[in-house]
Amino acid sequence: QFSKAWSLAIIKSDNLEEMKICANTVNGLINFEMDLHIKLCKKYGISKKNLINAEERNKNIAYSRYVLESGYSGDFLDLITPLIPCVIGYAEIGNNLKNYKPSNQMYKSWIQTYSGEEYQKISKSVGRLFDSAILSRLGKNFYKTRKWKSIQKKFKTAVLLEIDFWEMALE
């Protein structure tokens, strides 16, 4: 679902640079991140077919549909705002865990992917995209606009939905 949202961001983009960043993000999600998850699942006995056909959990539906609906009903900022906590969050978690040496190597490849240079580069690029989109659409005094309050609310909601998404693993 997040690949679809980033694909929609290409359409909602105002310029070629935004389109490139969104397209690179889609490429990273589909051609690298999905491969990681498929390999991890296979390693632990979950086939690609079972993974692809798995029933989507309610918390995942809530988060991903919130993002998509934000994009369908709003503009570029409305769409990318709820995407940011996921991208930046994974980069931060990966970075914080990169020197962690657990006795159980179950998550080693996950940590290497999200702390790795490629994902960190994507994360920084997405952060710059967000900053640039805010300035180009709302101006230097963005924090005084009505839209800024909406962006803050969307971001906070997305963070809470991202937390719920992570908590699914504990259920």
Regions found by a protein language model. Give the residues of each.
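Hydrophobic/aromatic-rich, well-ordered segments within soluble, folded domains that form packed cores
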Residues: 1-6, 89, 163-166
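Short loop-to-alpha-helix "cap/lid" segments that border enzyme active sites
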Residues: 123-138
